[in-house]
């Protein structure tokens, strides 16, 4: 009995990063060491559902949507403190979060850049100013229907989400150059 191990296909964006983007970044910033080249560590997709404090069923829709978009089961985030003004008790579910790494991360970024972002109405590009000073980029998406995995007829309510791309870049310029090379459509400011 022989066992054949079929190699899994390498995600398209990951292959492009290895073959084209990393060498171009090394040349642009003249790095002496290969490990200095900025790369993507993880992508965190967070969906805050503040209304879940009043209706706990709303969190189910958010987790279903996030699971469909990312291909991974989301972690339900719970309130750390009770806040009387918001009618919030400690331990109540108020959001859902997914952390993507490895091949799932590369495939999600590829779908985000090539399919989802162009589907946003009146989209003029992402703001190039939303970097955190350490090369990481966070932006918000107003509705989940831009992802083709979501069936528009089955949406119970429009939910937005925050997407954070964590990189190994040491400053914003390196992070911006990396994400621009990966295909992120930054608007000219």
From Swiss-Prot:
One of its GO terms (molecular function) is tRNA binding. GO terms for cellular component: ribonucleoprotein complex; ribosome. GO terms for biological process: translation. Pfam families: Ribosomal_L5, Ribosomal_L5_C. Disulfide bonds: none annotated. InterPro entries: Ribosomal_uL5, Ribosomal_uL5_bac-type, Ribosomal_uL5_C, Ribosomal_uL5_dom_sf, Ribosomal_uL5_N. It comes from the Bacteria. Part of the 50S ribosomal subunit; part of the 5S rRNA/L5/L18/L25 subcomplex. Contacts the 5S rRNA and the P site tRNA. Forms a bridge to the 30S subunit in the 70S ribosome. This is one of the proteins that bind and probably mediate the attachment of the 5S RNA into the large ribosomal subunit, where it forms part of the central protuberance. In the 70S ribosome it contacts protein S13 of the 30S subunit (bridge B1b), connecting the 2 subunits; this bridge is implicated in subunit movement. Contacts the P site tRNA; the 5S rRNA and some of its associated proteins might help stabilize positioning of ribosome-bound tRNAs. Belongs to the universal ribosomal protein uL5 family. This is Large ribosomal subunit protein uL5.
């Amino acid at each position: 009995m022989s066992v054949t191990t079929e190699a899994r296909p390498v995600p398209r964006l990951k292959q492009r990063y290895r073959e084209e983007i990393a060498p171009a970044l090394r040349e642009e910033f003249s790095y002496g060491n290969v490990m200095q080249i900025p790369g993507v560590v993880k992508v965190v997709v967070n969906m805050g559902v503040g209304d879940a404090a009043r209706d706990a069923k709303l969190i189910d829709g958010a987790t279903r949507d996030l699971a469909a978009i990312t291909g991974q089961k989301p972690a339900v985030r719970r309130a750390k403190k009770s806040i009387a003004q918001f009618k919030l008790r400690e331990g109540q579910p108020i959001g859902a979060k997914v952390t993507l790494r490895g091949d799932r991360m590369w495939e999600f970024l590829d779908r985000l850049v090539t399919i989802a972002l162009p589907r946003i109405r009146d989209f003029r590009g992402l703001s190039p100013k939303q970097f955190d000073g350490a090369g990481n980029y966070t932006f918000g998406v107003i509705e989940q229907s831009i992802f083709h995995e979501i069936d528009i007829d089955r949406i119970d309510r429009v939910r937005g989400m925050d997407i954070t791309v964590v990189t190994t870049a040491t400053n914003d310029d390196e992070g911006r150059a990396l994400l621009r090379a990966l295909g992120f459509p930054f608007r000219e400011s």
